[in-house]
Amino acid sequence: TGRSPIALPHFEGVEFDAFMTFNGSYCFTEDADIFSNPIPTEDVHMIIQNATALGRPLTVATKNRLASNGKDEDLIEYYSFAKQEIDVADDFEQVANEKVYQLMTGSSLAEHPALMKDVSHARITFWWNRAVDIIPTDGGKGRGIEKMLEYYHFDKSQAMAFGDGNNDIEMLKSVGHGVAMA
């Protein structure tokens, strides 16, 4: 999922052995981290600077926290898809210096180049045309799946994934049985 560990949905009667969150950047079990791939702090700060220049508030996401420096219509609606509300945090700058696994902001396709200007180790992924998730360049759902398969000693041919958006394509390619849902 692109969600944070604190925003995972609960399914009555279903227990999961492991979780792949932040579009594959943080994978874990109840007892152990499987894969931890935060965005370099200098890139986090550059993205914040670029978003500010565009007049776009954003959210930084750590393992335990989602902290925003403001909100706009696009970010509010993006959060609503996960039935969440934005936390405009007084300590945003402090949280931005922690291990940030993902940033979220409203953004049109035309804004993507300016948002990522001078950013070396992060990239955009998105499934909606009005907001983006920003993840490590060497991350993504495909990389998260690879790390999960390694951890459990499974071959790609033994894995199945379901996806419903553009940000799921690499995940579907990283398993033996990828199912694209409409």
What is the meaning of each model-derived region?
Residues 1-2, 164:
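Active-site glycine-centered loops adjacent to acidic/histidine catalytic or metal-binding residues
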Residues 2-74:
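Active-site phosphate-binding/coordination module
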Residues 14-15, 23, 118-121, 174-175:
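Short, structured coil segments at secondary-structure junctions
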Residues 10, 170-174:
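Well-formed, non-transmembrane alpha-helical positions, independent of function
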Residues 57, 177-178:
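Residue-level detector of anion-binding/catalytic polar loops
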Residues 3-4, 24, 107-111, 182:
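Short, polar loop motifs at secondary-structure junctions
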Residues 19, 178-180:
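Short, well-ordered beta-strand core segments
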Residues 46, 50, 54-171:
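Conserved acidic, metal-coordinating active-site core of Asp-based
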